Amino acid sequence: MDVVEVAGSWWAQEREDIIMKYEKGHRAGLPEDKGPKPFRSYNNNVDHLGIVHETELPPLTAREAKQIRREISRKSKWVDMLGDWEKYKSSRKLIDRAYKGMPMNIRGPMWSVLLNTEEMKLKNPGRYQIMKEKGKRSSEHIQRIDRDVSGTLRKHIFFRDRYGTKQRELLHILLAYEEYNPEVGYCRDLSHIAALFLLYLPEEDAFWALVQLLASERHSLQGFHSPNGGTVQGLQDQQEHVVATSQPKTMGHQDKKDLCGQCSPLGCLIRILIDGISLGLTLRLWDVYLVEGEQALMPITRIAFKVQQKRLTKTSRCGPWARFCNRFVDTWARDEDTVLKHLRASMKKLTRKQGDLPPPAKPEQGSSASRPVPASRGGKTLCKGDRQAPPGPPARFPRPIWSASPPRAPRSSTPCPGGAVREDTYPVGTQGVPSPALAQGGPQGSWRFLQWNSMPRLPTDLDVEGPWFRHYDFRQSCWVRAISQEDQLAPCWQAEHPAERVRSAFAAPSTDSDQGTPFRARDEQQCAPTSGPCLCGLHLESSQFPPGF
């Protein structure tokens, strides 16, 4: 018997031992795991969510009693919506009530309807049982799954007992999903998501809910667990832009301390939303996420940065991961209704500014981008009094943006009558930032953001009496700057415009104003030569994400 056969037989025996422990039930793990004693009574120390506390719970406060009465009164409204789902499934009333909170006894049926689990069960009769049995026989990650199951929601009464009923169901779901979707297989945090479904859904329904959550375009959660990681890349870029726009001091401090390069705030947020905050707030946030879709991820991230702005600016470089996680935990240590009100306001604000993450669009011809976006929605007036021409055909890129230098804008010989600055076309995903505004010392966007249509959009065809604006060489910097020297613009404008108008329209940034911008440190860092990998490669290294992503 060779080494391969010996290793195979050892893995098979190990797999059988783990499966046998779960089949025996919670008594199989008592001597080894020193878990809770069987037949223990939890009558007086279990709260309304099912969390087991060490001491006996005090009587209900007036606020808690009011919350229970309010939840009971809302139950009839949710029952009416479920009875007439075709009318309410796309209504504003559903979203409003989701932010106010779903009643606990309605959450299971509502999650099932939102994720369309009944239809999946009808289309795939008996498939879950087949996938579960195959996973028991051939799972390659059963040890990791067993280890993660042992630490999932252990304070909840359903998962309190080691090798108990709910832990066995959770193991079966993860084994079945590993066989159902080999591309994802098993990744970290899937156990926490499946456990949340098991709190309110039967075993097979929870499995199909997990399948729908990871497969639907509305939620786009598979990108966090797939090997490609496209969702993580895009949301990380989107998050950097939104935080840089709303809290420039916070983002500038993080860039100066290199916190964003050492850990993924969005990945940290996703992990903490699962098991780092109270279960009640976690369920409320998941209610909103299932109703709103992936657009709710950015508002949640924005709130975390906004609340912790002062603390984040004081975060030192020592131990960034632990400090950053602790800041997020403190962010959500507040009233649930208050958090949801802030989340709703942030959602409206980002939607109004087109800062939420839109759903993916159809791939464009000639582009190999991982997630293309629709064409630009139009241009913006660059200076006061300038005219704007109708938009032309959108520009196309032959290769991914963040893996190569940006394309040069083609030269145009078409004059611009009247001396007006015209903005005809944009590269896909570059709407929102007029180029001359960057010369005033404002924040400048990265080409890494061009894949996303809510990123800043840089014009490529500014026709100023013939010549086009040139960009700085990307071999030195990955930030695009508009040339603002009068001697370069004067030959284009001297026929019809005096030099004073040129200076007032496109003034060069002064040294004093440029030093105050939070992005200067980033520009100097990216322009300076380094011995490590180039920061202008416009792709995120795997070390920037937490393990398992």
UniProtKB/Swiss-Prot annotation:
The Rab-GAP TBC domain is annotated at 101-293
Sites of S-palmitoyl cysteine lipid attachment are C318, C325
Q: What else is known?
A: TBC1D3 is encoded by a collection of very similar paralogs with multiple copies of each paralog, some human genomes encoding well over 50 copies depending on ethnic origin of the donor.
What keywords would UniProt list here? Cell membrane, GTPase activation, Lipoprotein, Membrane, Palmitate, Ubl conjugation
What membrane topology is annotated for this entry? Answer: Lipid-anchor
Q: How is it modified after translation?
A: Ubiquitinated by a CUL7-based E3 ligase, which leads to proteasomal degradation.
Q: Does the keyword Transferase apply?
A: no
Highest taxon of the lineage: Eukaryota
A Pfam family assignment: RabGAP-TBC
Q: Which organism is it from?
A: Homo sapiens (Human)
What does the record give as the organism's lineage?
A: Eukaryota, Metazoa, Chordata, Craniata, Vertebrata
**Where expressed (tissues)?**
Expressed in pancreas, thymus and testis.
GO function term, MF aspect, one: GTPase activator activity
Q: What is this protein called?
A: TBC1 domain family member 3D
